[in-house]
């Protein structure tokens, strides 16, 4: 009897595996069937950046050598990006703490104050920063975040900050809903702290270090790894052959480089700051602290007339700012009508017969987790992958939906990842046929915050090339980019994952993918505009809005 029972269980297991394989094959065939053999020339089919002449800035090559041969257009693009970001930090020499920016002494004032404003009007706010001696600052470079909000309406939007490099800043808001609207301004980091962060970015890229385990038989060794390592010891070169993405490990003493089996985060370097520098990173003093108003901090907004409202409803153009706003806890993009996917059946209907590829860090893994939790028909299969690492796979057999998640290649600060699972996004994209039933979403940013900007630019350049090739061979493929987001900060976290670092990455990402033909989920504005505290992994209500926007790109409203 037990023998028959065992045979029955074995048969059932084999049958289940066979069903999954058949489903994967069937869904994958959809990609081939929907692939159109049209040689479509994209708006920017080369994936190149076109810019006016820019003045290059003097920077030493990362690691002391150039790791990638750039075309003249790529060199121009990189110089333009670096120059634009470099101008934000003035070089004023050493500054004592008492002369650094004090948020409690600084203030803002509403400039164009009026009895009331109409929806769609511009609101201007002047911010004047002072030091701890209550003396006006004479230079800029502080990193400010600003938003307008109405808590009772669960409404919010971000403002655009302009630095006049003299201690004065202007913030521009668009008033997008009626009612009592409050202004909030925060000092994320003083300019003196920003200079420290910039030094760490350029001089201490190894402040997050990685390791790999090498094993052969009973012998095992662990060595340090990174994008760049000192050349005075023998190295294992794991640079990717297709993308040229560099990755090195110190060579084990007894084992060959080919015996590497895992990759994992080694840890964070300590003692990065001097005592004087540490004063610029104090919780409750100068990290994400509010700047108070001098006078009223709110305005009254009244509705527009119907004709005016219709003309305001959707703003056109790639430079629309802000890109959207919250109202009753729902994100409202200003360029298009976003659908609300409040029922699992709505998501199932949208994704039916589709293959969805999610590539990147843990912030897009949240999408996988949300979908598999919210949609009961999406059943996750246990691939034996480490928790929080992946790869992960979920299938809806009834509706032919295949959902995949895979983390991006190193640098990645996850716990143990098998080395054969370290796949670069560009290489994965090159293996996708594409078509109208293929959806790709990418989020690559958080694990690059400690490196010089050239490292991130190179990674995005490789991904962009692969995206352009994918869209050229399959124009109906939907490609979505999830931007960076703000997060909680303390003295230590600021040195590795500061919003200032991520703001730079976000700026680079937007510029490099402008005109390529991808959709953008603006996670940056969606976290800054919301009333909930900033988190690396935003709360569910924010993730839900991100997914609603993502799915609206996949299944837009019919017009």
Swiss-Prot record:
Glycans are attached at residues 237, 292, 346. InterPro entries: Ig_E-set, NXPE4_C, NXPH/NXPE. It holds the Pfam family NXPE4_C. Keywords: Glycoprotein, Secreted, Signal. The keyword Phosphoprotein does not apply. It is found in: Secreted. GO terms for cellular component: extracellular region. Residues 1-30 form the signal peptide. Belongs to the NXPE family. This is NXPE family member 3.
């Amino acid at each position: 009897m037990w023998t028959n029972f065992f045979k029955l269980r074995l048969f059932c297991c084999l049958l289940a595996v066979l069903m999954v394989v058949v489903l994967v094959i069937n869904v994958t065939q959809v990609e081939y069937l929907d692939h159109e053999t049209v040689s479509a020339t994209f708006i920017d089919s080369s994936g190149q950046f076109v810019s006016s002449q820019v003045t290059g800035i003097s920077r030493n090559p990362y690691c002391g050598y150039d790791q990638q041969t750039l075309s003249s257009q790529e060199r121009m693009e990189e110089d333009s990006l670096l120059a634009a970001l470099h101008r934000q930090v003035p070089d004023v020499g050493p500054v004592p703490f008492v002369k650094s920016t004090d948020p409690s002494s600084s203030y803002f004032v509403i400039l164009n104050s009026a009895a009331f404003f109409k929806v769609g009007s511009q609101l201007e706010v002047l911010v004047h920063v002072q030091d701890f001696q209550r003396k006006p600052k004479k230079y800029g470079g502080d990193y400010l975040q600003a938003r307008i909000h109405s808590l009772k309406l669960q409404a919010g939007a971000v403002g655009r900050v302009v630095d006049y490099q003299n201690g004065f800043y202007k913030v521009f808001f668009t008033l997008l809903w009626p009612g009592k609207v409050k202004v909030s301004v925060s000092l994320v980091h003083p300019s003196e702290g920003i200079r420290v962060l910039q030094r760490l970015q350029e001089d201490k890229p190894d402040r997050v270090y990685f390791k790999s385990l090498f094993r052969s038989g009973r012998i095992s060794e662990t060595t340090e790894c990174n994008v760049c390592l000192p050349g005075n010891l023998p190295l294992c070169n794991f640079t990717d052959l297709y993308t040229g993405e560099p990755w090195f490990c110190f060579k084990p003493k007894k084992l060959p480089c080919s015996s590497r089996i895992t990759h994992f985060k080694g840890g964070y370097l300590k003692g990065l700051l001097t005592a004087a520098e540490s004063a610029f990173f104090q919780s409750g003093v100068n990290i994400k602290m509010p700047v108070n108003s001098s006078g009223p901090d709110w305005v009254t907004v009244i509705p527009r007339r119907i004709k005016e409202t219709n003309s305001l409803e959707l703003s056109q153009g790639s430079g629309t700012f802000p890109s959207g706003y919250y109202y009753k806890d729902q994100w409202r993009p200003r360029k298009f009508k976003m659908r609300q996917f409040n029922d699992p059946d709505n998501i199932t209907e949208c994704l039916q017969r589709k293959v969805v590829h999610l590539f990147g860090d843990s912030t897009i893994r949240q999408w996988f987790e949300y979908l598999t939790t919210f949609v009961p028909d999406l059943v996750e299969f246990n691939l034996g992958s480490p928790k929080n690492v992946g790869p992960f796979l979920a299938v809806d057999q009834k509706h032919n939906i295949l959902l995949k998640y895979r983390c991006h290649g190193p640098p990645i600060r996850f716990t143990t990842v098998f080395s054969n699972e370290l796949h670069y996004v560009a290489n994965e994209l090159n293996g996708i046929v594409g078509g109208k039933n293929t959806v790709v979403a990418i989020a690559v940013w958080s694990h690059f915050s400690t490196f010089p900007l050239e490292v991130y630019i190179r990674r995005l350049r490789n991904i962009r090339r692969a995206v352009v090739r994918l869209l050229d061979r399959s124009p109906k493929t939907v490609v979505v980019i999830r931007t960076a987001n703000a997060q909680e900060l303390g003295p230590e976290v600021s040195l590795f994952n500061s919003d200032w670092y991520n703001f730079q990455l976000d700026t680079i990402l937007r510029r490099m993918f402008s005109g390529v033909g991808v959709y953008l989920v603006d996670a940056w504005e969606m976290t800054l505009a919301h009333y909930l505290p900033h988190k690396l992994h935003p709360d569910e209500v924010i993730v839900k809005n991100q997914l609603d926007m993502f799915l609206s790109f996949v299944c837009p409203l019919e017009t």
